[in-house]
Design a protein with these regions (language model features):
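Autoprocessing Asn-cyclization modules and mimics
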Residues: 2-78
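Surface-exposed coil/turn segments at beta-strand junctions on protein surfaces, enriched
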Residues: 31, 111-115, 131, 164-166, ...
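Extracellular repetitive beta-rich solenoid segments
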Residues: 32, 47-48, 58-73, 106, ...
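Conserved "cap/hinge" positions at secondary-structure junctions
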Residues: 38-40, 122, 187
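Beta-strand signatures of extracellular beta-sandwich domains
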Residues: 44, 137-141, 184
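A short, structured loop/turn motif at beta-sheet edges
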Residues: 113-115, 141-148, 175-182
Length: 225
């Protein structure tokens, strides 16, 4: 199983207009370039150092610039380049790997190390900070080619007050895999503003981090003769 759940904390407070590098406890779990969620604002960045995000764009994906104080939670989000361009969905951690592994160069690719028939099941958590309902489409590719009939469309409601609309999309697909075959998850957003996002851990009540993306792969059988 694999997941994406980048999380850290803000080390130095930022004003509502600052575009200087953002200092955090650690960027180890974040991909670059990328985007982050801090309270109700999404911020794009182009690069990272061990403790900073650089190349900052404030108020992305329909959110508004606000000031943030040191100590608040920061989590990773994945957006699309635009309403007409889809994005692959990379993973940042491996929970268990038997016959399937992440490509070390491109972590959006989940590669077979043992040939067989596999059941791939995913869940993806989407947030919408705009005032308009949005549709998100998710599908799978094998070796860079769309898998027929693998797409599904789910609606993400508009925000309510300061809280985003949210939903979790989840389904599964059985795929024949030879050694070194790989699958990828892709998504698109009709508005271009809905993101796949990690929620921080809760304190009252206490609950664990809610990953933006989870994928499990179960070996079903050997390939048909």
């Amino acid at each position: 199983a694999f997941h994406q759940d980048g999380a850290t904390t803000l080390a130095v407070g930022i004003s509502n207009v600052s575009t200087t590098p953002i200092t955090v406890a650690s960027t180890a779990e974040f991909l670059a370039p990328g985007a982050l969620l801090i309270e109700s604002e999404i911020i794009k960045y182009t690069g990272v150092t061990p403790t900073t995000f650089t190349g900052i764009t404030r108020g992305a994906y329909g959110t508004t610039n606000v000031a943030h104080t040191a100590g608040v939670a920061i989590t990773e989000v994945l957006g699309v380049p635009s309403a007409t361009v889809a994005a692959p969905m990379p993973f940042t951690a491996t929970d268990a790997s038997y016959g399937i592994e992440l490509d070390p160069i491109n972590t959006a690719r989940v590669k077979a190390t043992v040939a067989g028939v596999y059941n791939f099941a995913f869940s993806a958590q989407f947030l919408n900070y705009t005032t308009v309902d949005d549709n998100v489409t998710v599908w799978m590719k094998k070796n860079g080619v769309d898998i027929p009939y693998s797409a599904g469309v789910t609606q993400v409601s508009s925000k309510h007050g300061s809280s985003p609309g949210s939903t979790i999309a989840a389904w599964n697909l059985v795929v024949d895999m030879n050694v070194n075959d790989y699958i990828e998850l892709y998504f698109s957003s009709t508005s271009g503003d809905t993101v796949c996002a990690t929620f921080p851990a809760g304190t009252a009540p206490v609950h664990p981090i809610s990953p933006s993306l989870i994928l499990s792969a179960t070996f079903v059988s050997a390939l048909p003769a």
